[in-house]
Amino acid sequence: MSSTAMVSGDDSLEPTLQSLLDQKTLRWVFVGGKGGVGKTTTSCSLAIQLAKVRKSVLLISTDPAHNLSDAFGQKFGKEARLVDGFDNLSAMEIDPNGSIQDLLSTGGDQADDPMAGLGLGGMMQDLAFSIPGVDEAMSFAEVLKQVKSLSYEVIVFDTAPTGHTLRFLQFPTVLEKALAKLSQLSSQFGPMLNSILGARGGLPGGQNLDEILSKMESLRETIGEVNAQFKDADLTTFVCVCIAEFLSLYETERMIQELTSYQIDTHCIVVNQLLFPGKDSSCEQCKARRKMQKKYLNEIEDLYEDFNVVRMPMLVEEVRGKEKLEKFSDMLVNPYVPPEE
């Protein structure tokens, strides 16, 4: 591996995620990859390591499969709750396909909540729906609501498989456009709408259009702030998870290209499920698979010489529960030493 400017005070890039633990400014960490490559195990394990060096860590799953509950053997939901056995690691699971109606609700008791109580009424809701991607994007507001009200030092996202991941990262931009469009329409037709709504008894929850607009503007500012943070390499990074196979490597390369186009930093790759048969092993299948894996591992190292590439072994047992996750997480910072081949 060649040296790069990304590493300070060292001649080579460590095959670990230690650099993420040392980066004290880091606030947002996305973990993503193709389905079935150990993405959730990696994100849970990274969150465990971060909890050792940070005051408070929030792990969020945006994968509809919601594997966090399975990984820790504990039920998580839409509200952040502490992971059993930790006093500074919390987790939550949100549905990225959450309906816009859940968030653009009808005011009432929630009228003071800029995200849950926008109270837009039928016409404004139709306008919101007309903006591509806004239905999915609105669930991002749920994340912002949690993050804003609870001050976590670092947030780890266990994202959905590759395609969904990148869509999720576009959500702040989609929402900014949606809210800007609604603000523009409302400023043009606001007085007329207010008089029509006044004649009909106003919007649900007794709000007027100006109140709704100010709530939307406050939401837009929050989204803009988060969007800027996502593009700041001091605050945000993306950890790619893959296995040493052609399709997974192809997906990883595509993902890295897209992340670069979104100006999102990525400099760590975790390669899971590697076989390390000993030199006395009689398993021909293991040796053949290892040969194939070495080929793709060499490609990964050639393509990403300025990345921290972490090599994780194929394990005999499933990584589930606090103890096994802690063991796995240790290998993210202390490289696994394979037997001699």
Swiss-Prot record:
Organism domain of life: Eukaryota
GO BP: tail-anchored membrane protein insertion into ER membrane
SUPFAM superfamilies, per the entry: P-loop containing nucleoside triphosphate hydrolases (SSF52540)
GO molecular function: ATP binding; ATP hydrolysis activity; metal ion binding
InterPro entries, per database record: Anion-transp_ATPase-like_dom, ATPase_ArsA/GET3, ATPase_ArsA/GET3_euk, P-loop_NTPase
CC terms in the record's Gene Ontology section: GET complex
Location within or outside the cell: Cytoplasm; Endoplasmic reticulum
EC assignment: 3.6.-.-
Active site: D63
Primary localization: cytoplasm
Name of one Pfam family that matches: ArsA_ATPase
Keywords assigned by UniProt, alphabetized: ATP-binding, Cytoplasm, Endoplasmic reticulum, Hydrolase, Metal-binding, Nucleotide-binding, Transport, Zinc
Family from the record: Belongs to the arsA ATPase family.
NCBIfam families the record matches: GET3_arsA_TRC40
Described purpose of this protein according to its UniProt entry: ATPase required for the post-translational delivery of tail-anchored (TA) proteins to the endoplasmic reticulum. Recognizes and selectively binds the transmembrane domain of TA proteins in the cytosol. This complex then targets to the endoplasmic reticulum by membrane-bound receptors, where the tail-anchored protein is released for insertion. This process is regulated by ATP binding and hydrolysis. ATP binding drives the homodimer towards the closed dimer state, facilitating recognition of newly synthesized TA membrane proteins. ATP hydrolysis is required for insertion.
Name of the protein this chain belongs to: ATPase GET3
